[in-house]
Amino acid sequence: MSLQILEKHRAVWQRKKILQDIYLYWYKQIRAQCVDLGPTLEIGGGGGNFKESFPEAISSDYTLCPWLDLNLDAHLLPFRSESLGNIVVLDVLHHLNRPLYFIEAAQRVLKKGGRLIMLEPCIT
């Protein structure tokens, strides 16, 4: 996704209170599931909305964004083994070319007892 598209997503977020309310509910649910074992990494931070609700999280995206902390490829997480307490993946898994590579990378960087918290859209 390009920076221009992500900027448009941020603008939509600012205009749509109902969208904010829905996601803020889920952000609270996600945060409640995080364990206190170390840093929390958000994969696919995009518009930066989760970062606003969880400022201490390390926010990242494949696209370089000035409002996020890191630019990275989710398939190749640039962290030491067993260095993270949580990884949050919100509406991202379906965008990954090799989701199993990501799962393996997440398993490597999470501490024992750490959590991979994922939420995916479902349209049926």
Language-model segments: residues:
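A short glycine-rich, Lys/Arg-flanked "PGG" loop and its adjoining helix->strand segment in the class I
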Residues: 100-115
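Short conserved AdoMet
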Residues: 35, 97, 111
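Conserved N-terminal segment of class I S-adenosyl-L-methionine
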Residues: 1-76, 103
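A short beta-strand submotif of the Rossmann-like class I SAM-dependent methyltransferase core
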Residues: 86-92, 118
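Active-site micro-motifs of SAM-dependent methyltransferase domains
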Residues: 76, 94, 123
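Surface-exposed loop/turn positions
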Residues: 38, 81-83, 114
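Conserved class I S-adenosyl-L-methionine
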Residues: 117-124
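A short acidic, Gly/Pro-enriched loop at the edge of an enzyme's catalytic core
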Residues: 75-87
